[in-house]
């Protein structure tokens, strides 16, 4: 039986505790620190990352042929090391790293013995991280369907015939070695996979951390270690793994590696470490890891399958809290080094939203936080980013004598171009003439750029499709105001043609999942397809721009966004809130008394709460199936002109201090759970009305929908207007922005954008 998403998130929450991130409320932080400081437990970490594999190791081709090597495994090691040292307080001397040629099979085993086993004392925590290639292997003489999971070391040669030895590190061998350590807590993170055989190392715009083939050979014990021959399948092995096991994907599914601005990293490792940086000590572990999984889904464009397994995964999390970790404030990064004489500093921005990285050098501003919240004064000063390399930024220090190394930092101002580009990767299966035509056609569109797959971060892919292509795991096309009973027939039923016969071209998510509504009804030329898909490209760009405004961690406005059932009594399903809101209402996320299932399908209501002392103006926007945008528009009396109506709506969309907005109000209009599975919900609150935004929405084509969300006629114009309104609010009430200005400036004290994704649905496993 596969692990359900809800169970995964519950189990995954335990991992944060095992790494030292215990639950604590702000009021109880003092006791938490005292208890943590009194503990003597130690954490020892071994971090392994391999980018440089000879081609002969992972594909059955001549060694002279160029292979598609990994690019992000070493970055994973850096991400984990910075997190362990500066978030959890692990001593640098307690962390050993093995990279590339150092990470031979023997080298890994000897490091486990020398650094972990020989030094660990009862009560300590052992952390083993591996980023690189994984594999499935078949041992000679075993059943043809019996495949065992392995990790591929730097010297893990690929057998040429069935009599050759497989020199991989078998996962079962690793589990047996780690399980032999007595009295310690073991946390294993594997950002590698033994995916099913494939013909390409790429999946959409991502690299797959797996061998392309399943080799057959014999097993040989590591020198000096007496262990039985591996025989346990991956699922059974995961269940009995010592301590906790965090996998980037289910066994047999691909672990992905992607490109971001100036660096590559494992999707799982980057999402996990970034979310831990963004999480406050009082937030629930399940909340933290739910959002790490959401980050993975946002980047890949489809449902992901990370797992948390192991012997301790099903035990009470209280067994894992005594780890010696000191909670620290949520942060976008920290000060790595400081040059007080030249007023410069180098920063680590491991917690900053990945979507903001390309724009950091435009003048991102950060301010320091106290290292221990509530126990130290807030340091003074502002840091302005001048350049970025990977996640290390060079910044200018303003308004402070100096800052100490390790000082946490949080964003206070971001600057973005008025004109944001949508990056489209061209599918590698396109023929040369098709690529030329696609490049030419897309170049004729404003605000659209193209790239080859796997070379840089892309927002979507353009490529050919056949009748067998369909949105994996997606619902059929849904009307935002449609009830469950009114859903149209399955999306695949609308596809014409015979399986395998090209139908034309479509748009895909970054992991190559077909986007709903992009398949043609009949064959077409490339330029025809680009013309047909242009409106959808603009809608995707609008969604990208909305994502660029999200700031739940850094916003200084106390706002809470929730999803509740409409049945009486209502139950809270999900909460998104700015961290500032927790200073005003210290409540914990409430879970449903019963999981939502196929047989239990309540209607839902959105609620937005202003916890501050000043009135705020709001926008509620939903994105259905990644590109169809809808907005909640309060009812107003007809006015003399469209512009006048927009002005009235802008003033009417106000949340007074302490007030709550509920949408929809009537149960009959409640949001069905099926629709929410394909929906993102944005709540944007601002200190000034959204004049320009409502002008862009309330055009003659707009159709008011009472107590429901209504379709936005021109989503891209709306998104650009949101930028303008937030920029104006950040400048002050009497400031008039000029369209000639190339940048918009958004200050964290002027707005908050909260993003909520679909609730977790527990489906019956058969």
Mark where each language-model region is.
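Functional beta-strand-loop-alpha-helix junction segments that form "active/interaction loops"
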Residues: 3, 7-11, 23-33, 69, ...
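Caspase-like (clan CD) cysteine peptidase catalytic core
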Residues: 27-30, 42, 105-203, 288
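Glycine- and acidic-residue-enriched helix-capping/strand-helix junction motifs
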Residues: 55-78, 259-263
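Active-site-proximal C-terminal subdomain of hydrolase catalytic domains
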Residues: 49, 99, 163, 167-171, ...
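Caspase-like cysteine protease fold
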Residues: 31-38, 45, 234-241, 279-346, ...
């Amino acid at each position: 039986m596969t692990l359900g998403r809800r169970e995964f998130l519950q189990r995954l929450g335990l991992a944060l505790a095992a790494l030292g991130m215990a639950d604590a409320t702000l009021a109880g932080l003092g006791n938490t620190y005292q208890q943590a400081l009194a503990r003597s437990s130690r954490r020892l970490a071994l971090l392994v990352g391999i980018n440089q594999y000879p081609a002969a190791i992972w594909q059955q081709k001549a060694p002279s042929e160029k292979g598609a090597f990994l690019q992000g495994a070493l970055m994973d090691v850096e991400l984990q090391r910075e997190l362990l040292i500066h978030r959890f307080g692990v001593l640098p001397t307690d962390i050993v790293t093995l990279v590339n040629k150092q990470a031979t099979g023997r080298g890994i085993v000897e490091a486990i013995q020398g650094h972990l086993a020989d030094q660990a004392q009862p009560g300590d925590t052992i952390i083993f991280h591996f980023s690189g290639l994984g594999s499935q292997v078949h041992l000679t003489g075993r059943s043809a369907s019996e495949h065992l999971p392995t990790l591929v070391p730097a010297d893990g040669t690929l057998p040429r015939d069935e009599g050759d030895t497989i020199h991989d590190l078998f996962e079962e061998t690793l589990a047996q070695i780690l399980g032999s350590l007595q009295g310690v807590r073991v946390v294993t993170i594997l950002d590698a996979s033994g995916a099913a055989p494939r013909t390409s190392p790429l999946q959409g715009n991502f690299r797959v951390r797996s061998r392309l083939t399943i080799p057959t050979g014999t097993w040989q014990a590591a020198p000096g270690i007496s262990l039985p021959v591996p025989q346990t399948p991956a699922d059974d092995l995961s269940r009995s793994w010592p301590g906790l096991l965090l996998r980037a994907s289910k066994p047999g599914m691909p672990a992905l590696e992607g490109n971001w601005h100036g660096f590559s990293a494992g999707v799982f490792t980057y999402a996990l470490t970034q979310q831990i940086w963004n999480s406050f000590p009082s937030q629930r572990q399940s909340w933290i890891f739910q959002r790490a999984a959401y980050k993975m889904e946002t980047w890949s464009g489809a449902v992901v399958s990370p797992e948390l397994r192991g012997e301790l995964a099903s035990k009470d999390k209280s067994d894992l809290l005594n780890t010696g970790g000191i909670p620290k404030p949520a942060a976008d990064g920290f000060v790595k080094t400081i040059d007080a004489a030249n007023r410069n500093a180098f920063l680590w921005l491991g917690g900053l939203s990945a979507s903001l990285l390309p724009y950091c050098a435009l003048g991102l501003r950060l301010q320091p936080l106290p290292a221990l919240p509530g126990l130290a004064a807030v340091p003074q000063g502002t840091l302005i980013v001048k350049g970025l390399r990977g996640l290390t930024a060079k910044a200018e220090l303003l308004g402070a004598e100096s800052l100490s190394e390790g000082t946490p930092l949080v964003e206070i101002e971001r600057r973005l171009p008025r004109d944001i580009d949508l990056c489209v990767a061209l599918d590698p299966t396109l023929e040369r003439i098709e690529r030329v035509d696609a490049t030419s056609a897309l170049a004729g569109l404003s605000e659209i750029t193209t790239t080859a797959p796997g070379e840089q971060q892309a927002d979507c892919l353009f490529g050919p499709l056949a009748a067998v292509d369909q949105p994996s795991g997606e619902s059929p096309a849904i009307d935002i105001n449609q009830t469950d009973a009114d859903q149209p027939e399955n999306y695949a039923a609308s596809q014409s043609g015979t399986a395998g016969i090209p139908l034309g071209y479509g748009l895909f998510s970054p992991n190559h999942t077909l986007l709903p509504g992009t398949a043609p009804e009949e064959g077409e030329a490339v330029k025809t397809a680009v013309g047909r898909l242009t409106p959808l490209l603009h809608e995707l760009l609008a969604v990208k721009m909305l994502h660029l405004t999200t700031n739940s961690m850094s916003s200084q406005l106390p706002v809470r966004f929730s999803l509740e059932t409409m049945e009486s009594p209502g139950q809270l399903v999900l909460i998104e809130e700015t961290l500032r809101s927790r200073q005003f209402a210290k409540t914990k996320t409430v879970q449903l008394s019963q999981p939502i299932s196929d047989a239990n399908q309540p209607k839902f209501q959105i609620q937005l709460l202003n916890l501050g002392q000043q009135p705020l103006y709001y926008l509620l926007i939903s994105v259905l199936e990644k590109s169809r945008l809808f907005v909640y528009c309060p009812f107003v009396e007809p006015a003399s002109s469209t512009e006048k109506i927009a002005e009235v709506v802008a003033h009417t969309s106000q949340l007074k201090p302490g007030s709550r907005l509920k949408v929809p109000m009537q149960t009959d209009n409640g949001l069905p759970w099926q629709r929410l599975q394909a929906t993102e919900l944005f709540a944007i609150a601002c200190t000034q009305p959204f004049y320009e935004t409502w002008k862009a929405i309330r055009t003659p084509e707009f159709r008011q929908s009472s107590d429901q969300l209504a379709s936005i006629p021109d989503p891209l114009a709306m998104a650009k207007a949101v930028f303008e309104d937030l920029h104006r609010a950040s400048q002050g009430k009497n400031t008039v922005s000029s369209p000639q200005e190339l940048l918009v400036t958004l200050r964290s004290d002027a707005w908050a954008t909260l993003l909520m994704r679909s609730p977790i649905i527990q489906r019956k496993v058969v």
